C-alpha cells in the first residue's frame, strides 16, 4: 500500500481449540519491496569480504516508448548501472564511463545516464547490471529495480 508492504499475521494452531484458546492478529510494516535485499558479503567474511561486486537482471524487454531505471536501494550513491544486450554484451552508450548513477534517495532512486533515457533501446531485450561498492561503514543494498515510463 503506497510506500509500505503490510503483512498481517496471527496465531493459529492445527489442533482442537479449548476454552482457553485466544487469537490475535498483528500487522508488520516494511518499506515498499524491502522484504529481501542483494548486497556484498559481510566485511569480516573469511575470503568473501569483497569491497565490490555486481548483480545482473534477467533479460527484460524495454517499453517501445522508452523508460527510466529507478532503484529501491540503501546507499545508492555506492552503485552504478550498466545496460547490456540479452547475451551479457555491454552496450557502449550505457556502460563504463557512460554508466548510469543513481541520484540520492531511498525507495525511488532515479538513475541518471549520460546518454539520456533508454528510448533508443525501446522494444529491445536487455539486461541491467548493478555495481555495488562498499565504502567504510556504508554497505549498499539493492531491494528492487523498476522500469518507469515517463508517460
Across the structure, where does each feature detected by a protein language model lie?
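Residue-level signal for short segments within beta-strands and strand-turn junctions
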Residues: 29-31, 83-87, 147-149
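Exposed low-complexity, polar/acidic, P/S/T/G-rich flexible segments that act as propeptides
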Residues: 32, 133-151
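A short beta-strand element within beta-rich, extracytoplasmic domains
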Residues: 63-76, 126-132
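Catalytic cores of secreted or luminal carbohydrate-active enzymes
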Residues: 1-56, 78
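Extracellular carbohydrate recognition and processing domains
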Residues: 91-121
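Beta-strand-rich binding/interaction modules
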Residues: 68-90
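Short beta-strand-plus-loop segments that form exposed binding edges in beta-rich domains
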Residues: 11-12, 129-136
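Short beta-strands within extracellular/lumenal beta-sheet-rich domains
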Residues: 39-66, 78-80, 108-116, 137-143
